[in-house]
Amino acid sequence: MLIDDRVINGQERISFMLRSLYSQHGYERYRMSKFEEYDLYSRNKDFLFSEGVITFTDTTGRLMALKPDVTLSIVKNRKDTPGSLQKLYYHENVYRVSGAADGFREQTQVGLECMGEVDDACIAEVLRLAAESLRLCSPDFMLEVSHLGILNAFVDAIAPEEKVKQAILACAGQKNLHGISGICRENHLAEGAENALIRLLGLYGTPRTVMPKIRELAEEFGAGEMAGQLSRSVAGFTGGDLEEKIQIDFSATGDLRYYNGIAFKGFISGIPGSVLSGGQYDKLMRKMGRKDRAIGFAVFLDMLERLTEEETTRA
């Protein structure tokens, strides 16, 4: 379908193309209210991108909140579907404290969620759609993929204590190798305990170039099966037109209280920070009483404001 640039702006054009992409792959539009009961967010505040939430009291006396997140609302309002798959996409506004400005800001997201019998093929499709989403935004992009189970196995081998483990994971997310070594020294851990993790974090590149090394290293820590899942999830990119746009990078992390398995972030040249973020969140599903598996991602349209008109035009 042709899009008339005279009547819509760049963000609207990208949003239209993303929604069309997801519909073509069998995802159905999901619409939701602008607000939820505040308790949903207070119980899952560590899952949110920012701490602040706009609240108000409705006419029945309930404390409500303008939604700061989409995924929590979808998980809460959908039911498990044993033996089947729910494929949903959304175009919604969220209300968060912006890191670039004081106070709250309305931010637009387009994304998708896949819930139910999520298998390797489903994960591979979601990764492909994440890459295609970035390409619709700009040809100069990179999708970084990791596996939190593998990362967790390496960190567990260093520090079983949760507080130390979280500090190491935070450094891993920043690729702060000196910070990891410093934490190990401060907590009197075995000399060289962090060496394998540092080797893992140093493996950065296309799946073809780094997966053999990752699988070999993961086997030493009992994470061979998870390395196999990572390999299968990205195998479809090898030899294709997107191969050089996919990088394995274990600094793509998420909160292990909510996320598990595959995690990924998308970047576009000239824009600081990720414009796309996603991953598997089976742990969040369990926390909210759900049995389904789940994976999804969001594209942060407000981050694309810096793109020029030329960059936001489909090649």
Language-model regions, residue ranges each:
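General small-molecule cofactor/ligand-binding pocket signal
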Residues: 30, 144, 247-249
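Extended alpha-helical scaffolds
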Residues: 137-140, 144-155, 161-164, 178
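Beta-rich nucleic-acid/ligand-interaction surfaces
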Residues: 32-51, 146-156, 252-261
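TRNA-binding/sensing appendages of the translation machinery
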Residues: 1-67, 124
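Positively charged, Gly/Ser-enriched RNA/tRNA-binding surfaces
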Residues: 7-25, 37, 69-82, 89-139, ...
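Acidic, His- and aromatic-enriched active-site or binding-groove loops in soluble protein domains
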Residues: 52-60, 160-182, 189
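A conserved hydrophobic position in a structured secondary element of the catalytic/binding core
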Residues: 66, 146, 299
